Amino acid sequence: MPIARLFLLLLLGLSLIPLNACVRQRDGDAGEVEVLRSGALNRAGDEDIPNVAYVNVRDMTNRVFHLGSQAEAWLGRKGFTVTDNPSQAGYIVQISVLAAGPVDPDSLRAVVDAGYDGPSKLSGTGGTALLADVLLVQRRVPSARRPSRANLKNISNRNAVASSQMRLGLLVRHDIRLKAGLPPYFADVLARELSTAISAADGEADASPPSSAR
């Protein structure tokens, strides 16, 4: 009898291991996301920049899905017209997703503070993070728009009146089991933060204050 009871207790203990792992690696939700920032997207002085935006996303992690469409949707809510032709855009937004995955929460601040184009390697465990660099180019748009085959960099430089950069880090203070990628709310929170920053740089669109930086 004691041996049978011991065997049952052992089976019960083993069955709880996957359950505990699931608790530690829950997906979480958008309300848990902390936003860290370095740099800012600035206004273009007194220039009259059309409220037309073009969004380009480079995801070097393949872990953040639908970020482009989310960013376009949020910009639309802020009063921008979104175009798929960069030569028609007054606001060209380049989003580079640099890292996504496990991180030591206390180490993320230094990575974000490294700023745009700085070191971007995440290290440690205990949290989950997304790191992105954002380049905003504001430009005049000629009234006569001709089709162009120039690349995005040339279009951004043409008629540019201002550019600014920022780095964003999104942090959830627990481990998340990464399947195909990060949970969808990471892309939504990042898109919302970007749209608010771009709207503030526009100065006329609906610029609700961003969530508090940490």
Stretch-by-stretch model annotation:
Residues 87-159:
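Surface-exposed short loop/turn segments
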Residues 50, 88-90, 163:
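Sequence-level motif detector for i,i+2 pairs with an aromatic at +2
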Residues 78-88:
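Short, well-structured beta-strand/strand-turn elements
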Residues 21-80, 98, 165-188, 192, ...:
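A structural "domain/chain start" motif
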